[in-house]
Amino acid sequence: NYTTQAIQNDTFAINLAHIEGKLDAERFRARLALQTGTSVNANYSNETTNQKYSNQNSVRNIQEAYVGIKLGKKTWLDAGIYMGNIGFEAWVSAYNWVYTRAIVLDNVPYYSTGVRLSHEISDQLSVQLHIMNGWQNITDNNKDKALGMQVAYKISDKMKFTYNNFIGNETTAPTKTDTIGTVYMYSNEQIKNYTSPY
């Protein structure tokens, strides 16, 4: 029995509550979303705890905090904390097709911190490039940055193909005998069919 984020049983609790503000201007955009709940405590438990100004306690209530500037007619550059680009379902259950999520969602990053360059090549084709602190972390856990990419192709009004990837070194503290570290690669292809079952 796998439900949304059931980290507690037989108790009343708030899974996720958030409030957000958004700015959409012609050349600038921004979003700030604050959050709390049991899923927040669980999902931010791997954030770095030893940094003075950015640590697990100071960042876990930030769902998104980014600003963007329009570089061209169909090109945006965003910087800050934003929802992860990989995966078919969202962390906020209300945004999903069904309330009970797939277990695969727990193997993709809910959020990313970094810089995102997005460009709409045509009405059908768009691309994104990401430079991030790493796999689902706000405070960088090492000196290396991660890279990500997305290519989305709208086949029709009811169907879209999306390809995402991620590559990055996610080793937190390599020892003298482990200097190579761990490189984490993720590739995700998804086809969305927008036909309603109802």
Language model regions located:
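Surface-exposed beta-loop-beta
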Residues: N137-Y198
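Outer membrane beta-barrel
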Residues: N1-Q136, K143-G148, A152-F161
